[in-house]
Amino acid sequence: MDSLYLVMPAYNEEENIAEVVRAWYPVLDGKDEASRMVVADSGSTDGTHSILEELRTEFPKLEILSDTDKQHGPKVIALYDYAIQHGATYIFQTDSDGQTDPAEFEAFWNLRERYAGIFGFRKERGDGKIRAFVERVVCLLLGLYFRVTVPDANAPFRLMRAETVAKYLPRMAPDYNLPNIMMTTFFAYYGERIRFRKITFRPRQAGVNSVNVRKIIGIGWKALGDFRAFRKEMIADGKGDNA
């Protein structure tokens, strides 16, 4: 039976984390006994970590990573690596802010044998027009830099074969801040069998997003240099339909 590692980063999510864990934990029902929910919480200054520790008594397959970088991207990388090292067959990543809907997971799971990666597509977003615009710009840049066409590169709703993630994860430094964007790009660039499926993306359920517009601009500016470096490496290796 296929094992699933459901992974999510968390940072100062005391208002959301208990509800999110309770909503997503049932996804593990019917999966291999080795399946786990893993939350990376490092750097939180509120009660997120203590709430997670309390939840572990209620949910025995819940595990906590507390020794990662506090930033979102490095946490995602650490979670992917943890799942791979512990023998996951599939990795599903989402966020801990309550914006995604667990009811939409099963449709992804049912397609798992046909694709190396199934990625959420946020056709409508509840987190504002600015973020939707940024995502469109990102997808445009990926087309320019890597000649890939993707409708949503960064959606925190993705089911991937762990063995495929393991092929590309070493290409990113442990502290890289946009791993999901590049993971989507790698899958598309190297011709992995992928599918995008529309998902619901609600407004943040509580709390404050730790990444504001100013940070987004700074991250985006740095990303241009990162994309150039990745493209140079990808062309040099001579692989993929777009090389």
Q: Whereabouts are the PLM-identified features?
A:
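Conserved donor nucleotide-binding strand/loop of the catalytic core
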Residues: 38, 49-86
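Short loop->beta transition adjacent to catalytic acidic/histidine clusters or analogous donor-positioning motifs
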Residues: 2-4, 25-38, 47, 60-62
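Acceptor/aglycone-binding surface of glycosyltransferases and processive sugar-polymer synthases
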Residues: 67-82, 90, 102-177, 204-214, ...
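Short beta-strand-to-loop acidic/aromatic patch adjacent to the donor-nucleotide binding site
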Residues: 88-99
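Short, well-formed alpha-helical segments that are part of the catalytic scaffolds
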Residues: 13-28
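Hydrophobic helical membrane-anchoring modules
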Residues: 1-3, 171-243
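A conserved acidic beta->alpha catalytic loop
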Residues: 41-50, 98
